[in-house]
From Swiss-Prot:
One GO BP: phospholipid catabolic process
Listed PROSITE patterns: C2 (PS50004), PLD (PS50035)
Domain spans labelled C2: 1-125
GO molecular function: calcium ion binding; phospholipase D activity
EC number: 3.1.4.4
Name of this protein: Phospholipase D alpha 1
Keywords, ordered alphabetically: Calcium, Hydrolase, Lipid degradation, Lipid metabolism, Metal-binding, Repeat
Domain notes: C2 domain is a calcium-binding fold, and the binding promotes the protein association with membranes. A lower affinity toward calcium can be anticipated for PLD alpha due to the absence of two potential calcium ligands.
């Protein structure tokens, strides 16, 4: 049966199986289980029956496990499923769970074509065995399905029409009104970074300074400071700009937190416990997160610092639990404090929260100039970060690895949602309860309420999203019914919040003109990859974001409208670029790009167009090249002869590491958080993540382009990356804009990769160094198999030994 595109939303209810065996005799499953139990020695177990929902081989839903009903399991569970898949069947698989996996009981097939008219289908479907024959008992499963094509969504391709837009549906946290948002590019913005960007109402964009604001927020706290991080390093100062010093600004972060705790402020920290940081690996661990060092620093102090492993929820098998606890991380990066009111003069306090991609650790402090060598005797002398070359050190000199990132501050009712997220996590994994009893602060702490008036032109509507499950958050509902009401996804005895992926999907589907993405990773939708040299079913990077992007572009091409997606990623994932894990991720990235370009090329050909596909989807990376200055820091040692480190030092160049996790849609809506565009971050049951989605209701792209703070922030980012502003950048959906950006990035790549350059690179935005054929194939650029100063293939290489779950 031919496959058809299901692009929209599936509503599915799985009711029950009528009978799994005939009469009272043993079924095939019973014999299988007896054999397994005897072989592995787990003893006789209780049948735990569950059902899965697949679009062909892509898992899109899973029920809870039903115990002690081996004959007639009844789930009565409903699912809200976003889909962007080509499929001929929706497959319902019935399984019995066991300690090392699951035993197949049978499959039922629902032809997709029966759903395309949008009518509700309620039926019993015959269950087939492994050989596609009816089961001996003639078992059937009762399901109800209804498909809503994406074009039936009232928000499809319409942007945010009014300030009454209610936010992303089916989520744990509702959208909050009357908020304030501050957006940060990099950890710091120096005074001489002043792009003149016009906003609505005759105003101009003003940058904010992330680590200065976090320093002020921590310093001002009187009652609580709550921090979560992938890494928190005590030995860093937050204030480093000699032109913007603050009283007490030279204090290190660890000492600042100790000082606040000594003042009576409740300081509680959840830092990811890198389980590789044991002696066999060295104390820093494979990830060098300083987790043990941070814990030891706060031992026997009033700071409550908990090393927090990524524990599995209780629903997985032994094998699944092992994967979660050893492969995945806590990746949320938040700070929550009580803070004075904006104009002071009151004993009242409010909640203020920070959410984004920047950990409070070494290697993160940087500015829009992203120096390689010039700050090695100042801001980066004691914070030299270069993990891409073995043995790199300040003694051996630059280039350091510059760090580009994005963060946000939220105020108003949304800040309380970030606080609640911390409380949920602490109550699950924080040990003894040291959380401040907020009821005791009723007279001091202003409850969740708007911080702007309804007619304030600068107000924001903001919604909090997460990737997290019941293994990391306390108080998730126990039943699928309650989980569904709370906007959560129920799995195999696991309750999951997967709303970050939902937020991206909804924003892409709403988009009208353009999308701008910066992300540390870009891979996924593996169900749509070419399968000529891999088994795509084993990859499991099933999140929809890349496919949603390409389908949006395809739809616009079909309608004769222009739509452009700009994506900025790092040259390679941080680490030694020749290593197997880095090469594997680059391979997944190439396959993702190729899948998207194939979609675009097919759509162009169907319309008889011979356009360059890079006019619709274009990938960039960031890099810098710095001429030697007199009086520059001189290293006392030299890198290894003929090493990539030495070549990069001699050529005065290196990538700027893109660690951002951000998407801007039509200059009216922005997502900022900790989540990468990969399966680890978007799954919900892998890495824990947090993000916020926000817009200004008085600055929407309705009749005229949006010219609020989201627009100003994008323009400031482009000024940072390109070193200039151009009138065409005001309208990224126009061909003039994408051609200008591509032309400048191509030129900067040529300068970056050239043998000699005796001046600073004029801009940081570089073409991602791959070619795109008119057939959509991703190829090497002529003479550019490897990244400069490395022997690492740009197109990557599939790994024969690393499991995909680790690198996707």
């Amino acid at each position: 049966m031919s496959k058809v595109l299901l692009h929209g939303t599936l509503h599915v209810t799985v009711y029950e199986v009528d009978k799994l065996r005939e009469g009272g005799g043993p079924n095939v499953f019973g014999k299988l289980m007896a054999n397994i139990q005897e072989t592995v020695g787990f003893g006789e177990g209780t049948p735990k029956i569950y059902a899965t929902i697949d679009l062909e081989k892509s898992r899109v839903g899973r029920t809870r496990m039903i115990e002690n009903e081996p004959q007639n399991p009844r789930w009565y569970e409903s699912f809200h499923i976003y889909c962007a898949h080509h499929a001929s069947n929706i497959i319902f698989t019935v399984k019995d769970d066991n300690p090392i996996g699951a035993t197949l009981l049978g499959r039922a097939y629902m032809p997709v074509r029966e759903l395309l008219d949008g009518d509700e289908v309620d039926k019993w479907i015959e269950i087939m065995d492994e050989d596609n024959n009816p089961t001996p008992a003639g078992s059937k499963i009762h399901v109800k399905l209804q498909y809503f094509d994406v074009t039936q969504d009232r928000n499809w391709d319409r942007g945010i029409k009014t300030g009454k837009y209610p936010g992303v549906p089916y989520t744990f946290f509702a959208q909050r009104q009357g908020c304030r948002v501050s957006l940060y590019q990099d950890a710091h913005v120096p005074d001489n970074f002043i792009p003149k960007i016009s906003l609505a109402g005759g105003k101009y964009y003003e940058p904010h300074r992330c680590w200065e604001d976090i320093f002020d927020a921590i310093s001002d706290a009187k009652h609580f400071i709550y921090i979560t991080g992938w890494s928190v390093y005590t030995q860093i100062p937050l204030i480093r700009d000699p032109n913007r010093q603050k009283p007490g600004g030279d204090v290190l972060l660890g000492q600042l937190l100790k000082k606040k705790a000594d003042e009576g402020v409740r300081v509680a920290m959840l830092v990811w416990d890198d389980r590789t940081s044991v002696n066999v690996f060295k104390e820093d661990g494979l990830m060098a997160t300083h987790d043990e060092e941070t814990e030891n620093f706060f031992k026997d102090t009033d700071v409550h610092c908990i090393l927090c492993p990524r524990d599995p929820d209780d629903g997985g098998s032994i094998i699944q639990d092992l994967k979660v606890s050893t492969m995945f991380t806590h990746h949320q990066k938040i700070v929550v404090v009580d803070h004075e009111l904006p104009r002071g003069g009151s004993q009242k306090r409010r909640v203020m929260s920070f959410v984004g991609g920047i950990d409070l650790c070494d290697g993160r402090y940087d500015s829009a100039f992203h120096p390689l060598f010039s700050t090695l005797d100042s801001a980066h002398h004691d914070d030299f970060h270069q993990p891409n070359y073995a043995g790199a050190s300040i003694a051996k000199g630059g280039p350091r690895e510059p760090w580009h990132d994005i963060h946000s501050r939220v105020e108003g009712p949304i800040a309380w949602d970030v606080l609640f997220n911390f409380e949920q996590r602490w109550r699950k994994q924080g040990g003894k309860n040291v959380l401040v009893d907020l009821k005791q602060l009723d007279d001091i702490l202003i409850p969740p309420s708007p911080v702007t008036f309804p007619n304030d032109q600068e107000t924001w509507n903001v919604q909090l999203f997460r990737s997290i499950d019941g293994g990391a958050a306390f108080g998730f509902p126990d039943t699928p019914e309650e989980a569904s009401k709370s906007g959560l996804v129920s799995g195999k005895d696991n309750i999951i919040d997967r709303s970050i992926q939902d937020a991206y999907i909804n924003a892409i589907r709403r988009a009208k003109h353009f999308i701008y993405i910066e992300n540390q990773y870009f891979l996924g939708s593996s169900f749509a990859w070419k399968s000529d040299d891999i088994d795509v079913d084993e990859v499991g990077a099933l999140h929809l974001i890349p496919k949603e992007l390409s389908l949006k572009i395809v739809t616009k091409i079909q309608e004769g409208e222009k739509f452009i997606v700009y994506i900025v990623v790092p040259m390679w994932p941080e680490g030694i670029p020749e290593n197997g894990s880095v090469q594997a991720i680059l391979d997944w990235q190439r396959r993702t790009m190729e899948m998207m370009y194939k979609d675009i090329v097919d759509a162009l050909q169907d319309k008889g167009l011979d356009d360059d596909p890079r006019e619709y989807l274009t990938f960039f990376c960031l890099g810098n090249r710095e001429a030697k200055k007199s009086g520059e820091y001189e290293p006392t040692e030299a890198p290894e002869p003929d090493s990539g480190y030495l070549h990069a030092q001699e050529n005065r160049r290196f990538m700027i590491y893109v660690h951002s996790k951000m998407m801007i849609v039509d200059d009216e809506y922005i997502i900022v958080g900790s989540a990468n565009i990969n399966q680890r971050s978007m799954d919900g049951a892998r890495d824990s993540e947090i993000a916020m989605g926000a817009y200004q209701p008085y600055h929407l792209a309705t009749q005229t382009p949006a010219r609020g703070h989201v627009h100003g922030f994008r323009m400031a980012l482009w000024y940072e990356h390109l070193g200039m502003l151009d009138d065409s950048f005001e309208r990224p959906e126009n061909k003039d804009c994408v051609n200008k950006a591509n032309e400048m990035a191509d030129k900067c790549w040529d300068l970056y990769a050239s043998e000699d350059l005796d001046r600073d690179l004029p801009g940081h935005l570089l073409r991602y160094p791959v070619g795109v054929t008119r057939k959509g194939d991703i190829t090497e650029l002529p003479g550019t198999e490897c990244f400069p100063d490395t022997s690492a293939r740009i197109l990557g290489a599939k790994s024969d030994y690393l499991p995909p779950i680790l690198t996707t």
